[in-house]
Amino acid sequence: MKDLLNLLKNQGQVEEFDAIRIGLASPEMIRSWSFGEVKKPETINYRTFKPERDGLFCAKIFGPVKDYECLCGKYKRLKHRGVICEKCGVEVALAKVRRERMAHIELASPVAHIWFLKSLPSRIGLLMDMTLRDIERVLYFESYVVIDPGMTTLEKGQLLNDEQYFEALEEFGDDFDARMGAEAVRELLHAIDLEHEIGRLREEIPQTNSETKIKKLSKRLKLMEAFQGSGNLPEWMVLTVLPVLPPDLRPLVPLDGGRFATSDLNDLYRRVINRNNRLKRLLDLSAPDIIVRNEKRMLQEAVDALLDNGRRGRAITGSNKRPLKSLADMIKGKQGRFRQNLLGKRVDYSGRSVITVGPTLRLHQCGLPKKMALELFKPFIFGKLEMRGLATTIKAAKKMVERELPEVWDVLAEVIREHPVLLNRAPTLHRLGIQAFEPVLIEGKAIQLHPLVCAAYNADFDGDQMAVHVPLTLEAQLEARALMMSTNNILSPANGEPIIVPSQDVVLGLYYMTREAINAKGEGRVFADLQEVDRVFRAGEAALHAKIKVRISETVNDRDGGSVSATRIVDTTVGRALLFQVVPKGLSFDVVNLPMKKKAISKLINQCYRVVGLKETVIFADQLMYTGFAYSTISGVSIGVNDFVIPDEKARIIGAATDEVKEIESQYASGLVTQGEKYNKVIDLWSKANDEVSKAMMANLSKEKVIDRNGDEVEQESFNSMYMMADSGARGSAAQIRQLAGMRGLMAKPDGSIIETPITANFREGLSVLQYFISTHGARKGLADTALKTANSGYLTRRLVDVAQDLVVTEIDCGTEHGLLMTPHIEGGDVVEPLGERVLGRVIARDVFKPGTEDVIVPAGTLVDEKWVEFIELNSIDEVIVRSPISCETRYGICAKCYGRDLARGHQVNIGEAVGVIAAQSIGEPGTQLTMRTFHIGGAASRTSAADSVQVKNGGTVRLHNLKHVERVDGHLVAVSRSGELAIADDFGRERERYKLPYGAVISVKEGDKVDAGAIVAKWDPHTHPIVTEMKGTVTYVGMEEGITIKRQTDELTGMTNIEVLDVKDRPAAGKDIRPAVKMVGMDGKDLLLPGTDVPAQYFLPANALVGVADGAQIAIGDVIARIPQETSKTRDITGGLPRVADLFEARRPKEASILAEVSGTIAFGKETKGKRRLVITPNDGSDPYEELIPKWRHLNVFEGEQVNRGEVISDGPSDPHDILRLLGVSALAKYIVNEIQDVYRLQGVKINDKHIETILRQMLRKVEIAESGDSSFIKGDQMELTHVLVENERLSTEDKFVAKFTRVLLGITKASLSTESFISAASFQETTRVLTEAAVTGKRDYLRGLKENVVVGRLIPAGTGLAYHSERKRRRDADKPLRVSASEVEAALTEALNSSGN
């Protein structure tokens, strides 16, 4: 017995390790793992079912089949443990050693390992400096390779086919050695002198000029250094011994009916053994060369199939035509070892059932069916029954539970008390998808869920199912209660706003009770206190909506923790007074003295949380819910067909639109407008009509006429049921009501383009057959979209989690002074996000001064909370530099100051918080709400984009930002730059609106002018691009010959003549190389120069430009020389929604990206090539000019002689993030990506905090490219981890050596995940084979810093409570360090020493 206890104790010891290293196994190492050689392909005896000796399941090699029993049955029981039976040779041990004991196969001829051969880039190929095809020809016995040329003219590594080989034999005899097959490759690899080669390559690289050659050499050099550093020998990539997997990991299971189910690996091993044995026999018989050669080739193919079936040639299939699953297939993909078993395990103690509503529950409770609870808590019940003496043994307890005796239920109730359970709803898209509740036993079979947590789970009660898990250990229960309880997760981690927000019925009820009605019963009465209001309402003496006065006493907490009590009389309604009864002390009456729409309720809960704290808020949320349900029941709101009131104006509006469309059709028929223009105009018209109808409808619905107390007819907000639902935010939206009572509007075709004929009917009138047919398409597309979206969104989340999983808060402060500049986010005339909102929860990086003074009003290092936000807004501060995850200088992980506030808790983030995963989930979770569509500019979308003026919304002072302009004779300014912006600042100097000014805009105000609201301050023609002169003079035409480069056009309507520049394609041969231009000459007939340069002022005219000035005409500054019609610039598709977010995170280079100026300087055009223009920028500092070839069809924004700054746009198009990083730096890139991603989410009304996006961006910017290696060991052009380079540079600078110079590189999330330091994390993500091959060759160490690696090796993750565990473990181990070295460590050290010295 004592033996047994010791045995159990020994099994429980955990290996202590800090890193995992992967490498190539030497033949000696494989033999040292092995317990014997497998010599026969047999598996088990078909009669006795016992394993065959020396076969694939041999008990002598792998261990006994039954516990403590040898095969022949001579030794049984525990007492013979460790005895080796002399009859059958089997050791008496536990049967589970068959899971760990390996064997080996001695190969009769060496075999190349397919991973190192075929996984690109081929490692064997790189080392030997041969192409993959050549090596394959050698390996598969098609050519000879020269191993030792001796004194002959042959070269080492040269390939010879049969003829050449025999010729060489005749010529040189035995002076040279050439062979084929893997042994030849092994010899060549063995002969490589790594040290000598590395030295040679290091000398060769600096002397090479060609880029491709340098790349190739540095690849080889890296590989050789990896081999040298890791202690792997190149010849180990060719196997001479093959390890055999333990038999219980490739089981053979008897099925009923005498058949067997077997793992595919057994078939693959059998082929290898068969071929190997046949080859041995052939070699013993010294068979003819050709036969041996064929057998060797077959052996190579068999081993290939075993290691990675289908990697080369056709996959070997089993009896059912299905490819066999090889060792590589076992570990890769969703069904592979990593994702199926290591990262996604099944869980015991769990149940699942349908969910129903639990409106009577408290927020921290869930209803658990008794039957389910009984099953889940069984072990606890058994224990309790035994402890109470109700059952003598566990077996008896089990019987009691099965019979469901009354005592059992009592015990169950006791066991369940204060034992939280976890509820999970798939898909778990963010951490709120699993929360803890206290179970309440209920009858029935469905789980009851509290309505307020539905939003977090995204659950509804139309048949959703949820899973229940029981936290078993005390620690697990503690964490569930303290961290996962639904009451502790009131705020969403994505944006810090409450996620416990009432929806639907509750909102409707609260809205209904806080509305006011004119002339309701009891209007105008005055009440002494809230209790009186309650009594009168219950007695039916006052209606819920009656306007009354009431005396209230309230206590209001301020931000600093003090509170003020007061009594006052307020104007309100009965309903609001009743609602105030449930509002916690500390909030003012004003928070409920308004109609409670969904936004208002959310704001109320938020305010409650910030002012009175968590506990009160939870109680309040529950009370709100109960009240809401009660009053939505009382309201009796329902929908009937008569609620859809169709506006009378609808017929008139549609009639007018139809007439206009007819007019456009007739214009098109007579050729005045093009097809495209007609289409755009018609769609514009119908969009306008639709808007008008819906405006009329909403106006109609939202107001109703009533008689007031004085008998007059007045308007009040409508009590129409449908309007109330939409207005409160309970259900439905204006767009949906429009389809019910307005008109359905325009529909889209399958390709996303809009159909010209709209559906003029609505659902109340009913659709005609044609209209129904048109609309089916959109409905079906909606469903198909949803299915696609879910998969794509899930994949995006997976990639995001993977790239950010190892980002954990590891220290309080990294001490950096850098940060990001935050300004209010202003689009057009709207402040989309005020500065206060953007800096909330961030730490200030540099002191903030009061505008115009030197007074510090917010010191650096302040965590901005709501109080500070008010302060910043009050002092009209325009910009603040805040700490950001991107600029954090913590080596591994991130510091709390750079991250700022933990959004879900409302205080500074704790050390150990897994901020990377939270960021990934926050971005990925709303992904399913994004659209999959790409928008075509055209139709409804383009109406907004064709702005032609700036009309200011608020009065204020004009500010012009980086605007280059010239002043016209009439005093107006004309913009001659593209990045110019016009902003309006209010009296405090805060910018309230900001507009982009296109080139050629005429601005009627100057910097510092005061303007009134509604003033139009700038105008331009949206349909053409002008070319504006910057000087006055006389026009001279250059190269403008009619019929050759230009054509004259007379407008039919106006009779005016235009000159149009011909496209190069349409010109005759004589005009192909002529560049038409307009030149400016002075009074004296000399060429004028552009101001500030010595470039002649001439404006080259692009194709299709319309010239508006005559030859010899006098023109003034700011006049327009020519216009380029806008139609020519191709209509781009705007990628919207999910694909856009994915593109940004993958850092994909857009097609036809905008071209940015690489240097600052003056523009000129050089000699053109076929189809391309040569753009030359001469830098102002006199360094070498920069040249770039640009395709002719790209429309350039710059003219000869113009000044540009580095990073300015030369040719429009979507921005390329890589260019922004290279030319403008990290903070410009951060601003661009954050804004672009936020735009997509904002369009769907999703709020995500900027710092989540910055957190992911930090991971995308992990790598740098070495520009100059200095004295470091890096190679120029290498991509290295930033931290790695910084550490190396610190070391070099302390030794007074030259440091390496580098540039930051932006990697897409997939690439960043695959290039992470941890090979376990990368291998479990994608491209498993490639990652593992790379890691093995370089002998990589994984220091298990991330979360994923630790989950894979089965440890606690180093985040949250696990971080404490890990640091304690390290501390303990460091304290015990000198004391003991375990036997396994000694053994490991010995084998490593043997391996490195062996061979």
Curated annotation (Swiss-Prot):
SMART domains (alphabetical): RPOLA_N
Entry-linked InterPro entries: DNA-dir_RpoC_beta_prime, DNA-dir_RpoC_beta_prime_bact, RNA_pol_asu, RNA_pol_N, RNA_pol_Rpb1_1, RNA_pol_Rpb1_3, RNA_pol_Rpb1_3_sf, RNA_pol_Rpb1_4
CC cofactor note: Binds 1 Mg(2+) ion per subunit.
Binding positions for Mg(2+) per the UniProt entry: 460, 462, 464
Keyword Transferase: yes
Molecular function (Gene Ontology), one example: zinc ion binding
Residues binding Zn(2+) 1: 70, 72, 85, 88
GO biological process, one term: DNA-templated transcription
Cofactor(s) annotated in UniProt: Mg(2+); Zn(2+)
Recorded GO CC terms: DNA-directed RNA polymerase complex
Alphabetical list of Gene3D superfamilies matching this protein: 1.10.132.30, 1.10.150.390, 1.10.1790.20, 1.10.40.90, 2.40.40.20, 2.40.50.100, RNA polymerase II, clamp domain, RNA polymerase Rpb1, domain 3
Catalytic activity: RNA(n) + a ribonucleoside 5'-triphosphate = RNA(n+1) + diphosphate
EC number assigned by the record: 2.7.7.6
SUPFAM superfamilies the record matches: beta and beta-prime subunits of DNA dependent RNA-polymerase
Record-listed Zn(2+) 2 binding positions: 814, 888, 895, 898
Domain of life: Bacteria
HAMAP family the record matches: RNApol_bact_RpoC
Function: DNA-dependent RNA polymerase catalyzes the transcription of DNA into RNA using the four ribonucleoside triphosphates as substrates.
Family: Belongs to the RNA polymerase beta' chain family.
Subunit-level organization: The RNAP catalytic core consists of 2 alpha, 1 beta, 1 beta' and 1 omega subunit. When a sigma factor is associated with the core the holoenzyme is formed, which can initiate transcription.
Protein name per its UniProtKB record: DNA-directed RNA polymerase subunit beta'
Source organism per UniProt: Pseudomonas fluorescens (strain ATCC BAA-477 / NRRL B-23932 / Pf-5)
